[in-house]
Amino acid sequence: MNRILKQVSNTKGKGIRFYSSSSQLDSEYMFPSVRRLLVEYGINSSKEVTATGPQNRLLKGDVLAYIKTKNLSPVDRLSLIASSVKSSQPSSSSSPSIVDSPTLTSQIKDQIKIVTTITNDKNKSKVIYEDIPNNNIRRVIATKLSQSKQQVPHFYMTVECELDNVLAMRKSMPENVKISVNDFVLRACALALRDNPQANSKWSDEHGEAILNPTVDISFAVSTDRGLITPIITNTDKKQLLAISNESKQLALKARDGKLKPEEFIGGTFSVSNLGMFGITSFNAIINYPQAGILAIGTGRKVLRPPSTYQPIETNLNASYGSEGKSEIINTNGPLTTEQLEKLFDNTVSKKQDIKQQIINEQPQPPKYEQPKVANVMDVTLSGDNRVFDDEIAGKFLSSFKYYLSNPQNMIL
């Protein structure tokens, strides 16, 4: 027999009372939709509603009309059950729980268990966690990154650069000279900015146009315990590779020790962020506002390069069998003499095996083709301010950067 849950109030407090459909709801033939409406709107008894159906049966329309007349609203069943459970639970722990009542349907039991769990959880102690406050550097970084992402129209371009020549040059250097791949990257970036001055610009909100920077000052990202710092190598394009390497090491050490002066990390005209040491293939960096561009450097990886051409690079199509392998033609206008017959026999019979072997040895060889090769490459992604960079400027800058990195001998001149 179906049961429904009813909330009642009396002088002793609130409780849960269950009614049989044959008693308070008066009819065993009540439609499910009617029963659902009675429960949803907190109508305690079907007697409150005037039935107009056959054999005095309560119809859905009757309940809807009653709801409209009384201007009723659906009740919060979970709140209803929660308050009922709280007031109905006995004080003694040995008393049976109301959830164990045999008169409850399984659905209502599940709801009561859920609400009881929520109620009990509220009484438990809160989860302990550690709140790590931001330091001043992290606050400044968060403000600048938010400002950059919200106000600067970012766009992205990626180019693949070969590292074979850079790696070969590093290997050929003396052991006491320690120049990293990132030093080559900084030098290549500086020269590319020098060759493409429009890429070394910034946007002026005051003038509403891009302004060229007079110097090439590259910021490079350094991770510290206090946050990400970007020390600046001033006049990078005018410094040789070894000078850039030494200065970047000194600035990185000072950044980790917290000893950088303001002029050593505030400013800059362009930035480089390298995550290759973490195995990151490629990523998009946020522009270091008010700069207009930043290069995101990925890790080096090996790829298989197909041949640049599929035409033969070496052939042996003009092989000759030699004079000994050729049949000698004997011209005569008359009958062959004995001497001529012997000579002809020698050329065609006695040397047959030698001629055959010589022909086999001097057969034309198949043509040789250029073979695929393994190359070391890395992806470099430019994040640019689209107010300063257009496609042509960005393309020329990345092309110059790729050229210098692929031909490092031009960076030490």
UniProtKB/Swiss-Prot annotation:
Location in the cell reads: Mitochondrion
One molecular function GO term is:
acyltransferase activity
Task: Tell me a GO biological process for this protein.
Answer: glycolytic process
Transit sequence range: 1-19
Put simply, this protein is called: Pyruvate dehydrogenase complex subunit homolog DDB_G0271564, mitochondrial
Gene encoding this polypeptide? pdhX
Q: Name the Gene3D superfamilies for this protein.
A: Chloramphenicol acetyltransferase-like domain, E3-binding domain
Which organism is the protein's source?
Dictyostelium discoideum
Sorted alphabetically, the keyword list is: Glycolysis, Mitochondrion, Transit peptide
Question: What InterPro entries would the database entry show?
Answer: 2-oxoacid_DH_actylTfrase, CAT-like_dom_sf, E2/Pdx1, E3-bd_dom_sf, PSBD
